[in-house]
Each structure stands twice: as structure tokens, then as C-alpha cells.
Amino acid sequence: MSSASAKAQATAAVNNVLSLVLPGSAKIDHNSTKRQNNSKGSKAQLINANLKKAVRVRERDAHSIKKREQRNRRKLQRARQLAEDKVDQQAKLDILRKHREEDSLTAKERKFLNKVINKNVRDLKSWDVDAEELHELQESVLRNTSQRSSLQKRKRKQRRDDFDESKKPVSGDHRYPGLTPGLAPVGLSDEEDSDEE
């Protein structure tokens, strides 16, 4: 018994190692003692097939690694380009500021400066609108949550009141001192109609 379980564990370990080293390789069956080479082909063919599978897996992995590296390179390149553009823009603005202070702006520089100013003003106005919209959104969320919570409170109170009403007895309390429950006093009948007479 122990030798069979040990053999099964060893076979499983070998299969795990083979799957790590040669992905897609055929697993070893621990139940069969003889190899069935006739149905699968010769050992050389099996080795060749396993190597081809391993090469395909490596190529696929290499392709995905290349794609990932290309994506990272593109991200870095975009970040560098943005940083360079920002530095260039700042240098241009410094030159324009210096020319404006010296009153030596050309028509082209004045036009560019006006465009930059208009763009900055537009951006600032759009930020103000966003702040207003954000404030309105916050107010509407607060209104909705307060309405929702008050509605939930009303429903809870209504359910409690309904429960309390259903708990109350339908008829009044007809207790008389000295009598056991369910017995009427002497001279009165159990019927309610006789009370009206």
C-alpha cells in the first residue's frame, strides 16, 4: 500500500517538474508499467513533438514580453515628450515675458501670447464651472440621501404602528372583579345584545 502511494506521489512530482520545464509535455501515468509507444510513435517522435511544443510556448512568451516592453517604451517616450514640451513651453513663455517687459514683442509673439492667455482663461473658467457643478452634485446627493433616510424612517415608523395596532385587542376589556375570566356577572347574559335592552 505504502509503495503504491509513494509511487503515485513520485509520479505526480515528476509530472509537475516536467510541466514546468517542458510545458505541454505528456504526463506520466502511474498506473501503467509498460509504455504504449506504438500508439504515440517512437521516442524520437515524442521528444521532437515535446520540443516543438516547448519552442511554441517560448515564442509565445517572448512575443508577449516584447509587446510589454514596447508598451513600456512608448509610455516612457510619451512621458519624456510631455516633459520636453512643458520645458519648451516654459522657455517660450519666459522669452515672451522678457520681450513684453522690454516692449519689443513682434506681431507673431503678441498673437501667440494672446492665444496662450485666452487658453489659460478658458481653462480657469472651465475649472470654475467644474467646481460649481461639483457643489451642485454634492447638494443633490445630500438631498437625496436625507430624503431617502427620512423615507426609510417613515416606513419603519409605519410598520411599527401597524404592528402595534394589530396587537391591540379588537373588543374592550370586560373584566369584573371577583369573577373568573369568561363568566358574566349575575343577572347579565353573555350576549352583547342584552346590554342594549
Swiss-Prot record:
A cellular component annotation (GO) from this entry: nucleolus
Compartmental location: Nucleus, Nucleolus
Location of region: Disordered: 25-84, 142-197
Disulfide bonds, paired cysteine numbers: none
InterPro entries listed in its UniProt record: Rrt14
Protein origin, superkingdom: Eukaryota
Biased composition (Polar residues): 34-48
Pfam families noted in UniProt: RRT14 (PF17075)
Keyword Transcription regulation in annotation: yes
Keyword Chaperone: no
Basic residues bias: start-end ranges: 65-78
Family: Belongs to the RRT14 family.
Job description of the protein: Involved in ribosome biogenesis, probably through modulation of rDNA transcription.
Protein name as it appears in the record: Regulator of rDNA transcription 14
